[in-house]
From Swiss-Prot:
Residues 618-650 form a coiled coil. The keyword rRNA-binding does not apply. InterPro entries: Coronin, DUF1899, G-protein_beta_WD-40_rep, WD40/YVTN_repeat-like_dom_sf, WD40_repeat_CS, WD40_repeat_dom_sf, WD40_rpt. The keyword Phosphoprotein applies. The lineage of its organism: Eukaryota, Fungi, Dikarya, Ascomycota, Saccharomycotina. Residues 408-609 are annotated as: Disordered. WD repeats lie at residues 79-110, 138-169, 180-210, 226-257. One of its GO terms (biological process) is actin cortical patch localization. The modification Phosphoserine is found at residues 441, 454, 456, 573, 579. Belongs to the WD repeat coronin family. This is Coronin-like protein. Keywords: Actin-binding, Coiled coil, Phosphoprotein, Repeat, WD repeat. It holds the Pfam family DUF1899. Gene3D superfamilies: YVTN repeat-like/Quinoprotein amine dehydrogenase.
Amino acid sequence: MSGKFVRASKYRHVFGQAAKKELQYEKLKVTNNAWDSNLLKTNGKFIAVNWNASGGGAFAVIPIEEVGKAPDQVPLFRGHTAQVLDTDFDPFNDHRIASGSDDSKIGIWDIPENYKFHDHVDEDGEPIDIKPVKFLTGHARKVGHVLYHPVAENVLASSSGDYTVKLWNVETGKDMITLKHPDMVTSMSFSYDGNYLATVARDKKLRVWNIREEKIVSEGPAHTGAKNQRVVWLGNSDRLATTGFSKLSDRQIGIWDAFNIEKGDLGGFYTVDQSSGILMPFYDEGNKILYLVGKGDGNIRYYEFQNDELFELSEFQSTEAQRGFAVAPKRMVNVKENEVLKGFKTVVDQRIEPVSFFVPRRSEEFQEDIYPDAPSNKPALTAEEWFSGKSVEGPILVSMRSIYDGSAPSFHEAKRPQQPTTQETALEEKKEQPKVEKPISESEKEVKQEAPKSPSPLKSASSSSTINHVLKEDNSINKLLKKSSDIDQVNNAEDPSRDTSGWEEADDEPAPIKIETPVTPTETKKDRTPKVEPSKELKPEPVSIATDRKQEQSLPQEEKSSEKTKSPEQEKSATPPSSITAAKTAITASSKEEPSAARTSPKSLGLKKSVEKLSTLVLQLEDVVDKLTKANLDKDERLLKLEQKIGELSK
C-alpha cells in the first residue's frame, strides 16, 4: 500500500500490546451465534458481551475495573425471548445501552449506579438480573445491528432482516424514519455531523442516505465477493472505507467518495490477504489511523489515511484468534502513556483480552500533536431538534489536554475541516503530487514510458494542437540558431548543408579529435554525441536561460581569439577554451586531448564545434518537448475530468 520504502510519519512506530493475564477477563460465556456482529461493545467504563444464555437471549455488562475470573453465576441483562445479536452504548449516557435481538425487538437498558459484575446479588446470594427500561417495536424480522447517533441524544438507528433501517426517538419509543433497502443491511455508519448514513447490504451495494429526506445521495457496487461487507465513515471527511471480498475470496479494503460512489473506489481496492474471516474496521479520527481486525484470526492491521490513500503502518500479531472486538472512545485512553487506542478482543469465546496501541515517546509532557480534541459525552442536539431538521457540524469536543492535566474539561463545537473536500480540489491535489504518496517502482516507470495510456481522441487532438501553437508562438529558437550561426562565422566554419568539406592533405593525419558531449544530471540521454543529419528539422522549443548566458559569455572570448589568431602557434592556445565553451560544461579537457586538438586544422575545428552545438541543442530540445507533451497531457486530463464533473452537476 505504501510500497517498500520508509515513509516519514509520526505514527510509523505505533505498536500494539496485549494486557497481562491478571488484567484480562476470564471464565466468560461468549455467544456462539453465527450472526455477523462484533459481539463486544465498550464505552470505556463498561464492556457489553453477547452471552451464551439459555431460556432466551441475554448479554452481560462488565465494569472495566472488574478484571479476573468471573463467578459461576453472573448478573445478566435479560428480557429478550431470542438471541441478542448486537448492542451499543449511548455516547451521551454511560449507563444506557441498547440491544437488538432475533425476536425483532430493540431493548433499552439502564445500568444501575451500584452495579457490580462479580457481586451484584440479592440477600440470598443469587445474582440480580437487569430488566429493560423499554422495548422498541416496529421491525418485522430480527434486528441485526443497532447504532446510536453521534451528535443527537436519544436517536438510535437499527437494521433488520425486513430490509429496512429505522431511526428511533428513544425517548418516545417511535420510529421516525424508515430507509428501505432491496436486501438485508450488513453494516452501517453515521457521518461525522450525523446527517448522512452509509450502508452496505447483501446486494453488494454501498449507499449513502440523506437520513431526514429518506433519499439516497449516492449509490454504487462495492466488493464483488459473496460474504458480508463492512463500512465505516472516515471521521470529519466525505470519505468512506469498506472491507469485503473479491470474487477470488481476497480480503479487500476500498476507499470511496461518499457523495460520488458511482465513479468507483478511489485508487482501486487494496488487497490484504486471502483469509476467510471478515475484516472489522475501526477508524481513529484524531490520528487518522484505520484499524482492521480480522474475524477468526489474531491479526490487527493498521493504516494511516492520508490524501485518499492508505499507508500501512504495522500489524499486531497474535496466535489467539478473535471473533469479537470493541474500541473505547478516544477520551478514555491513557494520555500519560501515549495510548492512542484502547481495544478489547474475545479469545476462544471464554476470555476478553485488552489490547492497547501506543506511540513510543520518552517525553513526559502532553503530546498535543497526537491528541487533538475528541468527541465528548455532551450531546450537540436533542432528538426533537434533530428530527425537526436542525444540524450542526459535528459532536461537542472535549480538550484532551484538560484530561491530561486532570482539570475541569473544556468543551467546544466541532468545525468543518479547513481544507475543501470537493472533487475538483481532491483531483488537483493528486495531480500536483502524484508520486509522493504512492511511489511507482522503476519497472512500472519503464512500462509507462514505453506504453503510455492511450488518451481519448479529444484529448490527443487538443494536446497536439496546443503544443504546436506554443511552439509557433515561441521565437527563442530563432535567436539560438542566429547565435550558433554567428559563432560559426567567428570560427570560420563552413555551412554543414553544403557538400564542400572535402578531405585535405592536412586531414589525413592520424588520431582525430574526439569530443564528447557531457550530459547534465537532469538529462537522460546517452553520453556520446549523436551525428547530426543536414535534413533533420529542429522543432522550435524554449531552451534554458543558463545555456544562453553561457553562449553569450563565450562569444567575446572567441571573437578576441579569432582576431588575434595570426599564426598556428596562437591558434593552438585558443582552441581548448572554445571547445570547452561549445560543450557548455565545466569539464576540462585532458592533457592527452589538447595536443591532438591543436593539430586539427582550423576549418575542421570550426565545423566540429558547430556540429557540437547543434547536437547539444537537439538533445535539450527533445527533452523539453517531452516535458511539454507530458504537462499538456496532464492538463487536458484534468480539464476533461472537470468538464465531466460540470456536466454531472448541471444535470
